[in-house]
Amino acid sequence: MRIILLGAPGAGKGTQAQFIMEKYGIPQISTGDMLRAAVKSGSELGKQAKDIMDAGKLVTDELVIALVKERIAQEDCRNGFLLDGFPRTIPQADAMKEAGINVDYVLEFDVPDELIVDRIVGRRVHAPSGRVYHVKFNPPKVEGKDDVTGEELTTRKDDQEETVRKRLVEYHQMTAPLIGYYSKEAEAGNTKYAKVDGTKPVAEVRADLEKILG
């Protein structure tokens, strides 16, 4: 089962990716992890990636596609894989298709921007332990304090409203066009496309995914 997850940051993809991986026994492939692993391994592709990144440039689509092909040929991908954060653009999706990387399901997590802002901006973290709270959805027992240690909770820089809104604008400009692209691919019978209502509680979203994926 080969799956692509689409959706803005904060749409709940990470939570559900974990569930899909466990239930269907497929690994999640993140291009960031893949690049780091390739660089560390010192492979030919890894060396190319390192040179580009050391020069402060963006890794080309061709190189990322080559890494994806190499990664999905590994033993743990024999039953499929889950791609999150790639492809991000239509040229990347085209390049994947040309490279013969076919996908069974494209799942779009649909959540309105304002709810995403609400979800992310309300997060509070206890940095030493990694415990995460939410002022509205999962508040600590004492406002602003960690339940276990009583230490101050903080807001991550990435969770500040201005940053979140900037990331949403980027998502709508770059990645949202993929929704139209994969809808057409599904009409042509090349993949299955499903829109998932990401505003529902986690357990309901999970049940919806089980219905879609079988």
UniProtKB/Swiss-Prot annotation:
Pathway: Purine metabolism; AMP biosynthesis via salvage pathway; AMP from ADP: step 1/1. Pfam families: ADK (PF00406), ADK_lid (PF05191). Optimum temperature is 45 degrees Celsius. Thermostable. Is half-inactivated at 52 degrees Celsius. AMP binds at T31, R36, K57, L58, V59, G85, F86, P87, R88, Q92, R156, R167. It catalyses: AMP + ATP = 2 ADP. InterPro entries: Adenyl_kin_sub, Adenylat/UMP-CMP_kin, Adenylat_kinase_CS, Adenylate_kinase_lid-dom, P-loop_NTPase. Its EC number is 2.7.4.3. Residues 30-59 are annotated as: NMP. The keyword Nucleotidyltransferase does not apply. Keywords: Acetylation, ATP-binding, Cytoplasm, Kinase, Nucleotide biosynthesis, Nucleotide-binding, Transferase. GO terms for molecular function: adenylate kinase activity; AMP binding; ATP binding; magnesium ion binding; nucleoside diphosphate kinase activity. CDD domains: ADK. GO terms for biological process: adenine metabolic process; ADP biosynthetic process; AMP salvage; nucleoside diphosphate metabolic process; nucleoside monophosphate metabolic process; purine ribonucleotide interconversion. ATP binds at G10, A11, G12, K13, G14, T15, R119, R123, V132, Y133, K200. Transmembrane segments: none annotated. The modification N6-acetyllysine is found at K192. Belongs to the adenylate kinase family. Catalyzes the reversible transfer of the terminal phosphate group between ATP and AMP. Plays an important role in cellular energy homeostasis and in adenine nucleotide metabolism. Monomer. This is Adenylate kinase. It comes from Escherichia coli (strain K12).
